[in-house]
Swiss-Prot record:
GO cellular component, one term: extracellular region
Compartment annotation: Secreted
Protein's recorded name: Chrysophsin-3
Predominant place of localization: secreted
Species name: Pagrus major (Red sea bream)
Modified-residue entries (Histidine amide), positions: H20
Length: 20
C-alpha cells in the first residue's frame, strides 16, 4: 500500500513539474 502511494505521489509530482 505504501509503495503504491509513493509511486502515485511521485508520478503526480513529475506530472506537475513537467506541466510547469
Amino acid at each position: 500500500f505504501i509503495g503504491l502511494l509513493i509511486s502515485a505521489g511521485k508520478a503526480i509530482h513529475d506530472l506537475i513539474r513537467r506541466r510547469h
